[in-house]
Amino acid sequence: ALSVLLQXSCTMCLFCCYL
């Protein structure tokens, strides 16, 4: 998922840190 790339970067991807 994108969370793997953004490492939970809520600033760029608000939902990624929850995936």
UniProtKB/Swiss-Prot annotation:
GO molecular function, one term: toxin activity
Compartments in which it is found: Secreted
Tissue: Expressed by the venom duct.
Parts of the chain that traverse the membrane: none
Main location: secreted
Gene Ontology cellular-component annotations: extracellular region
Key words, A-Z: Disulfide bond, Secreted, Toxin
PTM per Swiss-Prot/TrEMBL: Contains 2 disulfide bonds.
Domain statement: The cysteine framework is XVI (C-C-CC).
Official protein name in the record: Augerpeptide hhe9
Organism: Hastula hectica
